[in-house]
């Protein structure tokens, strides 16, 4: 049975960069966001439900209208919950199939919503990537030309979890404010994980 490692963090924190380091170190990575987008375009049941919810403009020539969906779900909490209820169960099943198809000693799951979707319960180890908000905003503005600062702050708010009870504790935290190299940090965590497997 594989040792499942979750890599999480808010938008712009650098979790994909950390996941890419794992990939280049030879580990298989399941990117929840990429797979969700793929399934939102290819799974006919999801396409039908999202079209019913948002209308024909949710898709352009078979491709997801990311700008419309992003603007819609981050401004309307109830709509975001409806979309998540459509997409998350399919993505979770897709992840389980991926795990079964890849019986490696260590597998990586990247997801911004590890705690929000309760998928943390099936992971053996969680790495949280964090960065200061102003740095995250700059990164996202440089990467996503269709977003503005207001949109980004809305997304950040939607990804925030209520941790008043202190139940959500990652095993490792990687600070990613651009001051230190990430590779040595990830390698150090890999060595610790390998000692547990």
Give residue ranges: language-model regions.
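ATP-binding Walker
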Residues: 13
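Hydrophobic anchor at the beta1->P-loop junction of P-loop NTPases
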Residues: 5-7
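ATP-dependent NMP and nucleoside kinases share a basic, alpha-helical "lid"
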Residues: 93-101, 106-142
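ATP-dependent small-molecule kinase phosphotransfer cores
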Residues: 34-103
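Small-molecule kinase domains that catalyze NTP-dependent phosphoryl transfer to phosphate-bearing small molecules
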Residues: 94, 121-122, 143-194
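P-loop (Walker A) phosphate-binding loop of NTP-binding proteins
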Residues: 10
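Post-Walker A helix-loop "phosphate-sensing" segment adjacent to the P-loop in P-loop NTPases
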Residues: 23-32, 44-45
């Amino acid at each position: 049975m594989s040792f499942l490692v979750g890599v999480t963090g808010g938008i712009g924190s650098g979790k994909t960069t950390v996941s890419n380091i794992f990939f280049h170190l030879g580990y298989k990575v399941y990117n929840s966001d990429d797979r969700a987008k793929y399934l939102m375009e290819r799974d006919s049941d999801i396409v039908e439900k999202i079209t019913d919810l948002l209308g024909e403009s949710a898709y352009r020539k078979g491709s997801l209208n990311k700008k419309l969906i992003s603007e819609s779900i981050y401004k309307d909490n109830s709509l975001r919950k409806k979309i998540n209820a459509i997409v998350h169960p399919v993505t979770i099943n897709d992840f389980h199939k991926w795990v079964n198809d890849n019986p490696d000693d260590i597998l990586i799951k990247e997801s911004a919503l590890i705690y929000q979707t309760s998928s943390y319960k099936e992971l053996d180890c969680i790495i949280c990537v964090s960065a200061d908000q102003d740095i995250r905003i700059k990164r996202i503005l440089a990467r996503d030309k269709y977003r503005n600062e207001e949109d980004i702050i809305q997304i950040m708010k939607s990804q925030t979890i209520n941790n008043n009870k202190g139940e959500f504790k990652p095993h490792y935290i990687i600070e990613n404010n651009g001051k230190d190299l990430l590779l040595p940090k990830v390698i150090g965590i890999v060595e610790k994980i390998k000692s547990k497997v």
